[in-house]
């Protein structure tokens, strides 16, 4: 007898999700390696190789350092009164004036860089009894001897160098940066030739601070024909405060002040080409896109940049769990649902239906559940970026040799921060991936339960993501199930009748197996009884003797 399931009286409807032949491996909280249909890379690992000049204003230092431009080295005059968002120092920068040192070089460099301007205001300092505008053949401005344009080298006038005592109040409403210096002659003879006194002294003070410097006379390595040195110092004068300069020799006086500004300007060492392009994030390697939450290009950044992490790759799942389709099955050779495997080739949705009925086979996507999953996943990348991208800049840290312990501590702190962010990134991505897989599985289960509630007793769950429908269900009927308009009452009687017929035939077919097993058991029992009876009869006749030994 033919099963009713093989004629036009039944149909099969399977639910499933799409799959791809080769998925992407991602990490979740519970599994280090799980395959998904699609994932996006979260770590930016390469730069453009060039620094973009938009939207940030980039100032190329060329062959000048920021401090040389600040002091007014003759070959850096082009930078007078310049402004910037990011000052780019080049490795080929050099000084071309009187040799100098800055005891607090890193702090001054950082202070000026963050101000973002070299705007200079000349003030009328009165230096009585001394010669101004000293120069050196180590600092040529054209053919003549020159000096730093923002500093005034004071020497003796005739045979005297009086004690200088000059005050300059700050009557403005902004901070003023004064740059000054102390000259260290190479010999005692040079000291008296320039300043008369055998030992000079320079004191610069405000209401908040005071610095007193005694020159160190002695020969040093020759630089540009000079064995003397100048030490550069700086003082900030707040609004309402007063700058007081007292000296009896060796003073390199200020000519005015730099107007200090507050902002997020910075400085970076880089040899990357500056080009006309747009990029929010800049590293010494060049600009990088900021459409990813993490980067491992460089620790030093400027602008709205991804967080630096140690990982070379972090994959964010933007698709569901991937279970490739068993290729030996064929498209409908043995129709199966999502519990067994995914479906390849379903390009118009993530979830869908496959059916087999009297009109043949077919497939259609379920757009509603697909859209529900996509809506929840779409914002993930933006949310991760929002959690990690900040408008900040990680400047370079510089320390003198005597600050080695501070430098070691700073390096330890920075390395610890990177370790923490690398760990946080790993956990954050794993959590998001776990959530993505859980919600896509949930949408599949919701669609399956929705279909089950529609079919009720008109169909049977086959246990593999498919339903056996016990009534004739043409393509219009299948479509009503997909769009949620299916009325199970219309087909209930037919489904019950077909179900009983099919179950009855299955039951009758099952009796044959039971009868065979029962017949075999009875035959074995009768054979044992006959054999036992024969043995007992033979013993009574004496044909068989049985001895029992203890």
Swiss-Prot record:
Bridged cysteine pairs (disulfide): 14-466, 52-277, 64-76, 97-139, 281-305, 473-477
Q: Which UniProt keywords apply?
A: Clathrin- and caveolin-independent endocytosis of virus by host, Clathrin-mediated endocytosis of virus by host, Disulfide bond, Fusion of virus membrane with host endosomal membrane, Fusion of virus membrane with host membrane, Glycoprotein, Hemagglutinin, Host cell membrane, Host membrane, Host-virus interaction, Lipoprotein, Membrane, Palmitate, Transmembrane, Transmembrane helix, Viral attachment to host cell, Viral envelope protein, Viral penetration into host cytoplasm, Virion, Virus endocytosis by host, Virus entry into host cell
User: Which positions make up the signal peptide?
Assistant: none
Query: Which residues are on the Extracellular side of the membrane?
Result: 1-514
Give the Gene Ontology MF terms in alphabetical order. host cell surface receptor binding
Query: What does the PTM comment of the record read?
Result: Palmitoylated. In natural infection, inactive HA is matured into HA1 and HA2 outside the cell by one or more trypsin-like, arginine-specific endoprotease secreted by the bronchial epithelial cells. One identified protease that may be involved in this process is secreted in lungs by club cells.
Give yes or no: UniProt keyword Disulfide bond: yes
Residues assigned to the Cytoplasmic compartment are 536-550
Tell me the domain of life: Viruses
The transmembrane segments are 515-535
Name any GO cellular component annotation: membrane
Q: Which InterPro entries match?
A: Capsid_hemagglutn, Hemagglutn_HA1_a/b_dom_sf, Hemagglutn_influenz_A, Hemagglutn_influenz_A/B
Q: How does it sit in the membrane?
A: Single-pass type I membrane protein
| Lipid-linked residues (S-palmitoyl cysteine) | 539, 546, 549
Anything else the record notes? Major glycoprotein, comprises over 80% of the envelope proteins present in virus particle. The extent of infection into host organism is determined by HA. Influenza viruses bud from the apical surface of polarized epithelial cells (e.g. bronchial epithelial cells) into lumen of lungs and are therefore usually pneumotropic. The reason is that HA is cleaved by tryptase clara which is restricted to lungs. However, HAs of H5 and H7 pantropic avian viruses subtypes can be cleaved by furin and subtilisin-type enzymes, allowing the virus to grow in other organs than lungs.
**Subunit field text:** Homotrimer of disulfide-linked HA1-HA2.
Role summary? Binds to sialic acid-containing receptors on the cell surface, bringing about the attachment of the virus particle to the cell. This attachment induces virion internalization either through clathrin-dependent endocytosis or through clathrin- and caveolin-independent pathway. Plays a major role in the determination of host range restriction and virulence. Class I viral fusion protein. Responsible for penetration of the virus into the cell cytoplasm by mediating the fusion of the membrane of the endocytosed virus particle with the endosomal membrane.
Q: Which family does it belong to?
A: Belongs to the influenza viruses hemagglutinin family.
Name the record gives this protein: Hemagglutinin
Q: Which source organism? A: Influenza A virus (strain A/Duck/Hong Kong/64/1976 H3)
The uppermost taxa in this organism's lineage are: Viruses, Riboviria, Orthornavirae, Negarnaviricota, Polyploviricotina
């Amino acid at each position: 007898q033919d099963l009713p399931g093989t004629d036009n009286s039944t149909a099969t409807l399977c639910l499933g999700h799409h799959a791809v032949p080769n998925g992407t491996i991602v990490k979740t909280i519970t599994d280090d390696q799980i395959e998904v249909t699609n994932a996006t890379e979260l770590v930016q690992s390469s730069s453009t190789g060039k620094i973009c000049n938009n939207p940030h204003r980039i100032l190329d230092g060329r062959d000048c350092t920021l401090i040389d431009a600040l002091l007014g080295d003759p070959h850096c005059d082009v930078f007078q009164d310049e402004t910037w968002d990011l000052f780019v120092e080049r490795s080929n920068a050099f000084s071309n004036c009187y040799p100098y040192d800055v005891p607090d070089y890193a702090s001054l460099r950082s202070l000026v860089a963050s101000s973002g301007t070299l705007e200079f205001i000349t003030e009328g300092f009165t230096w009585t009894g001394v010669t101004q505008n000293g120069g050196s053949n180590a600092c040529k401005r054209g053919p003549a001897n020159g000096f730093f344009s923002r500093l005034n080298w004071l020497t003796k006038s005739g045979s005297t160098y009086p004690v200088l005592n000059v005050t300059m109040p700050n009557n403005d409403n902004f901070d003023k940066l004064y740059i000054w210096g102390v000259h260290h002659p190479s010999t005692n003879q040079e000291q008296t030739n320039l300043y008369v006194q055998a030992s000079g002294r320079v004191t610069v003070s405000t209401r908040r601070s005071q610095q007193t410097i005694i020159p160190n006379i002695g020969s040093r390595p020759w630089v540009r024909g000079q064995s003397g040195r100048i030490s550069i110092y700086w003082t900030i004068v707040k609004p309402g405060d007063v700058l007081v300069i007292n000296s009896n020799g060796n003073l390199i006086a200020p000519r005015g002040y730099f107007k200090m500004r507050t902002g997020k300007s910075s400085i970076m060492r880089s040899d990357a080409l500056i080009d006309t392009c747009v990029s929010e994030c800049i590293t010494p390697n060049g600009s990088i896109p900021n459409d990813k939450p993490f980067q491992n290009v460089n620790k030093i950044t400027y602008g709205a940049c991804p967080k630096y992490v140690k990982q070379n790759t972090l994959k964010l799942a933007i698709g569901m769990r991937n279970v490739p389709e068993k290729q030996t099955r064929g498209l409908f050779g043995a129709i199966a649902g999502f519990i067994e495997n995914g479906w390849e080739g379903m390009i118009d949705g993530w979830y869908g239906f496959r059916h087999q009925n009297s009109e043949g086979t077919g497939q259609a996507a379920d757009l509603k559940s697909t859209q529900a999953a996509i809506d929840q996943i779409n914002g993930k990348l933006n949310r991760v970026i929002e959690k990690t991208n900040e408008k900040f800049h990680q400047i370079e840290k510089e320390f003198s040799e005597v600050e080695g312990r501070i430098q070691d501590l700073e390096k330890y702190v920075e390395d610890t921060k990177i370790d923490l962010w690398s760990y946080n990134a790993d956990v954050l991505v794993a959590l998001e991936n776990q959530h993505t897989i859980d919600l896509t599985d949930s949408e599949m289960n919701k669609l399956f339960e929705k279909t089950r509630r529609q079919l009720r007793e008109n169909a049977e769950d086959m246990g593999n993501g498919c339903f056996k429908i016990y009534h004739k269900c043409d393509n219009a009927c299948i479509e009503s199930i997909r769009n949620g308009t299916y009325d199970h009452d219309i087909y209930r009687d037919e489904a019950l009748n077909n179900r009983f017929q099919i179950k009855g035939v299955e039951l009758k077919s099952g009796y044959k197996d039971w009868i065979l097993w029962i017949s075999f058991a009875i035959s074995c029992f009768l054979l044992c009884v006959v054999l036992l009876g024969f043995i007992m009869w033979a013993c009574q006749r004496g044909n068989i003797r049985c001895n029992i030994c203890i």
